[in-house]
Amino acid sequence: MANSDRPTIIEKYANRRLYNTGTYTFVTLDDLGAMVKRGKDFLVYDAKTGADITRSVLAQIVFEQENSHGAR
């Protein structure tokens, strides 16, 4: 498997900050939403426990996008 085929690893910290371990930068839910739209795979792990929290973060992205579109 080539490096480009591997999902990007995102770590979520207790302060709710999201860290892209591939680019060594903090990202936002909007950034992750853009990754979804581009078809870029990623996994989100809780930085403290190592638990896979990708599903809950994806749900949060959908929820926030629905709220922002409903507010218009």
Language-model region placement:
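Membrane-proximal intrinsically disordered regions of secretory-pathway and membrane-system proteins
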Residues: 2-4
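Acidic/polar, low-complexity surface-binding segments
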Residues: 21-23, 30-72
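Active-site and channel-lining beta-strand-loop segments
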Residues: 15-20, 26
